[in-house]
UniProtKB/Swiss-Prot annotation:
Protein name: Pars intercerebralis major peptide D1
Entry's transmembrane regions: none
Subcellular location: Secreted
Species lineage: Eukaryota, Metazoa, Ecdysozoa, Arthropoda, Hexapoda
SMART domains tied to this protein: GRAN
């Protein structure tokens, strides 16, 4: 699981499919269900097309 110390303050921590901690390059980013992709705050993951939508 992620802790506040895992990633810099400008990034968001996401748990990978392997259960490890990964960093998303967006502040207050949204982790996608696949655990690989992430989206900027205010958007949602489009899992089918692997993109972020408003």
């Amino acid at each position: 699981s992620c802790t506040e110390k895992t990633c810099p303050g400008t990034e968001t921590c996401c748990t990978t499919p392997q259960g490890e901690e990964g960093c998303c390059p967006y502040k207050e980013g949204v982790c996608c269900l696949d655990g690989i992709h992430c989206c900027p705050s205010g958007t949602v993951c489009d899992e089918d097309h692997r993109r972020c939508i408003q």
